[in-house]
Amino acid sequence: MKTFSAKAHEVKRDWFVVDATDLVLGRLASEIAHRLRGKHKTIYTPHVDTGDYIVVINADKIKVTGNKALDKKYHRHSGYPGGISTTTFGKMQERFPGRALEKAVKGMLPKGPLGYAMFRKLKVYAGDKHDHVAQQPQPLVIQSQA
């Protein structure tokens, strides 16, 4: 018996749509990262992108537990001296709905070209409309545990 290794051109990728209304940020991001990597498939191979496409709608309605809406901080730096900028989860959700989910998922994927290719299969939309009706995405139910 030989160990199976998936080939990139043989992988069948499905499209799924996730409604993020009232789901917890970290738990949702973890499940999405798991599916983007393809770890839910029997043909999973670490060095091949075997994951599916995920479309997230209602990303503006994602929740965080506890007081993290005010306490959770996101930092970035412009590259100039004194150019550090900090924002909270609540402010980021108001200004850029869905960016917190993108950052959470991106942090859970591998770093490097393979991880970047996996991240490109994630499509996040703030409202309940998306541009991927032609791909006929199947609804994916993720259980809320909060």
From Swiss-Prot:
Pfam families referenced in this protein's UniProt entry, alphabetically: Ribosomal_L13
Q: Between which residues do disulfide bridges form?
A: none
Q: Which key words tag this protein in UniProt? A: Ribonucleoprotein, Ribosomal protein
The UniProt GO MF terms for this protein read: mRNA binding; structural constituent of ribosome
Q: Which GO terms describe its cellular component?
A: cytosolic large ribosomal subunit
Output one GO BP term. negative regulation of translation
Q: Which domain of life is it from?
A: Bacteria
Known partners and oligomeric status: Part of the 50S ribosomal subunit.
Q: Which function does this protein serve?
A: This protein is one of the early assembly proteins of the 50S ribosomal subunit, although it is not seen to bind rRNA by itself. It is important during the early stages of 50S assembly.
Similarity comment? Belongs to the universal ribosomal protein uL13 family.
Query: What is the recorded name of this protein?
Result: Large ribosomal subunit protein uL13
Q: Which organism is it from?
A: Methylobacillus flagellatus (strain ATCC 51484 / DSM 6875 / VKM B-1610 / KT)
**Which classification does the entry list for the species?**
Bacteria, Pseudomonadati, Pseudomonadota, Betaproteobacteria, Nitrosomonadales
